[in-house]
C-alpha cells in the first residue's frame, strides 16, 4: 500500500469521527465500509488507477466532513437539533431568493402532458 493511500485512509477515518461522533453504530459501519474498499483495492498495480482511488477516498473524506450533519429529534416536539460543527459547509441562500425560472433546472420548465 502506498503512502498517499495510507494518508487518504487515515484522513477518511478522521472524517468519520467528525461526521458520526456520538453515533457508534454508524461510525463503526462507515469505518468498516472504508476499510473494505481499501482492502478490495489493495493489489492494484496500475499507478493511474491507484491515484484515482486515492483521489476518490479523499473526496469521500471531504464530503463527510463538510456535508454530513447529525440531527437529534427534540423530545415531544416536531423539530430536530442539528449538530453543526466548524467544518460544516454552509450554503448560500442566494439561490433560494432567485425565481424558479432563473435556476437553470426543470424547476422553471413547463411540464408537457401526454394526451
Swiss-Prot record:
Purpose of the protein:
Assembly factor required for Rieske Fe-S protein RIP1 incorporation into the cytochrome b-c1 (CIII) complex. Functions as a chaperone, binding to this subunit within the mitochondrial matrix and stabilizing it prior to its translocation and insertion into the late CIII dimeric intermediate within the mitochondrial inner membrane. Modulates the mitochondrial matrix zinc pool.
Which species expresses this protein natively?
Clavispora lusitaniae (strain ATCC 42720) (Yeast)
GO CC, any one term = mitochondrial matrix
Similarity annotation: Belongs to the complex I LYR family. MZM1 subfamily.
Task: Kindly indicate whether the keyword Nucleotide-binding belongs to this entry.
Answer: no
Q: Which GO terms describe its molecular function?
A: protein folding chaperone
Q: Which protein is depicted?
A: Mitochondrial zinc maintenance protein 1, mitochondrial
What GO terms in the biological process aspect are recorded for it?
mitochondrial respiratory chain complex III assembly
- Assembly, per entry: Interacts with RIP1.
Gene this chain is encoded by: MZM1
Which residues does the annotated transit peptide occupy? 1-15
Record key words, sorted: Chaperone, Mitochondrion, Transit peptide
Query: Does the record bear Mitochondrion in its keywords?
Result: yes
Location relative to the cell: Mitochondrion matrix
Amino acid at each position: 500500500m502506498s503512502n498517499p493511500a495510507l494518508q487518504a485512509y487515515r484522513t477518511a477515518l478522521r472524517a468519520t469521527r467528525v461526521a458520526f461522533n456520538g453515533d457508534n453504530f454508524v461510525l463503526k459501519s462507515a469505518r468498516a465500509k472504508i476499510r473494505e474498499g481499501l482492502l478490495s483495492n489493495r493489489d492494484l498495480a496500475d499507478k493511474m488507477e491507484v491515484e484515482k482511488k486515492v483521489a476518490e477516498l479523499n473526496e469521500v473524506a471531504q464530503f463527510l466532513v463538510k456535508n454530513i450533519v447529525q440531527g437529534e429529534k427534540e423530545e415531544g416536539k416536531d423539530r430536530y437539533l442539528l449538530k453543526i460543527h466548524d467544518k460544516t459547509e454552509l450554503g448560500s441562500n442566494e439561490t433560494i431568493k432567485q425565481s424558479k425560472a432563473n435556476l437553470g433546472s426543470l424547476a422553471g420548465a413547463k411540464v408537457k402532458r401526454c394526451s
